[in-house]
Amino acid sequence: MKKKNRIKKNDEFQAVFQKGRSSANRQFVIYQLDKETQPYFRIGLSVSKKIGNAVVRNRIKRMIRQSITELKDEIDSGKDFVIIARKPCAEMTYEEFKKSLIHAFKRSGIKITNK
């Protein structure tokens, strides 16, 4: 993901948590905040230490980033997203992972067609 598409600062994360709305499935929680003046979307990732060691957490973050890269043309611009991974996603294959992430986006109201 490009630098402009990332949320890194704590106050930006807190703004999405406090002012945004959330939706979830068993593997992910997605918070989203509308930013009409922003011409692109931004993604922040959160993977808790409860999920596993650093190797497992980094693998999950890489799979989320890869999924977002493949779906970037279908995600609405002008929004900030924070994706929180839950424990069940640690044992998933990439195909199951991507399908679950698409399902979580659809639950949050983002229309994504599964290619």
UniProtKB/Swiss-Prot annotation:
Keyword terms of this UniProt record: Endonuclease, Hydrolase, Nuclease, RNA-binding, tRNA processing
Any one Pfam family match given in the protein's UniProt record, by short name: Ribonuclease_P
Organism: Bacillus cytotoxicus (strain DSM 22905 / CIP 110041 / 391-98 / NVH 391-98)
GO biological process: tRNA 5'-leader removal
SUPFAM superfamilies for the chain: Ribosomal protein S5 domain 2-like
Keyword match Signal: no
Enzyme class: hydrolase
GO molecular function: 3'-tRNA processing endoribonuclease activity; ribonuclease P activity; tRNA binding
UniProt-listed Enzyme Commission number(s): 3.1.26.5
Xref: Gene3D superfamilies: 3.30.230.10
GO CC terms, sorted: ribonuclease P complex
Protein name per Swiss-Prot or TrEMBL: Ribonuclease P protein component
InterPro entries reported for this sequence: Ribosomal_Su5_D2-typ_SF, Ribsml_uS5_D2-typ_fold_subgr, RNase_P, RNase_P_CS
Catalytic reaction annotation: Endonucleolytic cleavage of RNA, removing 5'-extranucleotides from tRNA precursor
Function: RNaseP catalyzes the removal of the 5'-leader sequence from pre-tRNA to produce the mature 5'-terminus. It can also cleave other RNA substrates such as 4.5S RNA. The protein component plays an auxiliary but essential role in vivo by binding to the 5'-leader sequence and broadening the substrate specificity of the ribozyme.
HAMAP family: RNase_P (MF_00227)
Family recorded in the similarity comment: Belongs to the RnpA family.
Subunit structure: Consists of a catalytic RNA component (M1 or rnpB) and a protein subunit.
